[in-house]
């Protein structure tokens, strides 16, 4: 291949061998970042063994695992193509598709720059501190050649010495990595810079923690806890389905989130969480969540989620399974790992239950509907979303709890959701090309339970209230409902929240509450309560002074005009939920408890 010097544009090389039927590299990419302060990666994309006079190149519009059309092509300001020194015509035919007029050339090179300056797990980022690449937001692909193998060569910015990725290295080629097809390339992030590397092995398989940033992290403790999570998950599935695994951990200011990949995961965390037990537990829950996705999503998956269509939304009713039941397992794995005890585990589960029970949207939208609508609702929330939506994460986690308890009770503690995922994993291994349908998932669950589970499916399919205690009673537990801190049954309640350091401005109004029926709006500034001037600091106390059943007259500023809103104080709803053991469990309850959590009752 002839080299083409082009100072402005970064290089991705796609190199396709002309020899048919061999195992040589078909597609390769070279990527560099000579000016990271500009936040532009430079790519050179070389296509060999070309047979078409017109070649379509595409840029994905979304990232698998993050269900929103993000239009990554908008970050590419210009694309050029060359065959040797001959410039080829490039036409844009729709928002994410280019046509290269290749003529009779067997090989041509595409050059482009792409802007990357969003710190999230689902996009790419480049600055003078590091480079993070998420494949779908970086790499163009040849429309009809997604399933050809290739290589990626990375040229780091000067002084950057480390490249972490889940892709295997190519022997004899510096900073070069191979992939079997575009799907794997798109699902294999890169972290480039001078980050720390922590390593451990489970079942003889190497695991790497690529740790970026400074914070109050105890690296030895981090590595030990990650290893425990991997070990406890491996006990479910027995074998690890990869030759190597990478945890990308980005310690940043005030940021969070995680995204699963085929043999890696990216997790952002606030750099100062690691000395706070509660925040660190939540971080480890995220780690367990993303790692469990190695099976549940990346392999065991709804039929719509792979192979992917990168051009448009990929709809499924089953994200409550893929994300929600994974959310159930993330806390359970911390218990099995010995990272938390039963009491702390119950608090973590209580947090999921609280998320559901305090959301008015649970009465409007089912978990199945939430799954399907994620493309237009979950990532596009507004001030009304909590009133009309339920998260398939939290409602799915709660449904997973009820499903696990139902299987446990139906089999006298002998079986659980573990056996469901073991069977689904066996099916995947027999046919990796196809995901499950909703019916197939439910059939596997019912076969494991030995009965129909319509009493559980209604929690996914409808907005029926969850009867927690009917299931928890069988394992000697009860769901305890509480008021929040400083709240009693006689505390007046209105159903709105505010923001603002000095003057309270309404940020949320809950459906069916005094504030909602009284006509209070988001963005109303509250000036006075019953004739008394209030500030953010004094508002709550003035409202508490009003007895349940009495009226509160609020003087508000709405769009710069003063007006009055009247509402009647009501009693408070429960807003804290936690599972507790009963004091005198029966022998059968103890047996089912131990079958559920795998830990002795008395421990």
Predicted regions and their residues:
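Juxtacatalytic substrate-recognition/specificity segment
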Residues: 196-319, 325, 329
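Intrinsic-disorder/low-complexity, polar/charged segments enriched in Ser/Thr/Lys/Arg/Asp/Glu/Gln
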Residues: 26-28, 40-44, 54-56, 107-109, ...
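Post-HExxH zinc-binding segment in Zn-dependent metallohydrolases
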Residues: 265-274, 299-300, 311-362, 555, ...
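Non-catalytic architectural context of zinc metalloproteases
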Residues: 69-78, 82-242, 255
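Bacterial N-terminal signal peptides
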Residues: 5-17
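N-terminal, post-signal-peptide region of Sec/Tat-exported proteins
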Residues: 47-84
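Early extracytoplasmic/domain-onset interaction patches
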Residues: 22-62, 132
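C-terminal recognition in membrane/secretory proteostasis and scaffolding
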Residues: 330, 340-603
